[in-house]
Each structure stands twice: as structure tokens, then as C-alpha cells.
Amino acid sequence: PKGVAGTYQFHIKAAGAQGSWLYLNTETDYRDRRSITVSIQPNVVAELQSKYGQPADTFFIDKKIEVTGEAKRVTIDFMSRGRATNKYYYQTHIAVSSIKQLRVIKS
């Protein structure tokens, strides 16, 4: 399916990293089909840490954010011994490639 471009507001409940990428999640279990994942490129992660003065993976927990981008369903493969299995699930991701796409909303 096509993605839906827009500006979205979310409460972040969890965060995780894979390599230098950061993932902010709207549910504590990122596999929950209701969860929206904001995937942040490594260069933006570094900028966010510099801007907020603390690691981005902890800073955003329990904060409300506004993110601009395309919400898109992506297929996530289950892996075994470094190889994709024939099992998978879906997540909704919004990719962030610029710090301008993301801001904390003051409540």
C-alpha cells in the first residue's frame, strides 16, 4: 500500500536502537500492530543528542512529539542465524532523515 504523508503527533512509550539507527515507538511492545515506529537515521540521532544534551533513546521516552513524514507499512522479517525466515510481521514506520522533521511538543 501507498504511504500517507502528513504531520503526526504521538506519545513515545519506548525506544530502541539497531546499529546507529534509533527507533521511537508509540507502544511499549514495538511488535504491537497499533504501534507506530519513528525510524531516525544515524546523522539525525547525533544531532538530537547534541540539541537535547542527552542520549536520544532515553530523552524521548514519555514525551509527546510531532513528526512530519510518510507513514508507511513495512514488512519485518523474523531472523534466524542471520537469515530471514518465512515468518514476518508488519510495522508502520515514519522515516526521519532531517532534524527538521521532528520536534517535542510542549504540554
Located regions from the model:
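OB-fold single-stranded nucleic acid-binding module
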Residues: 1-107
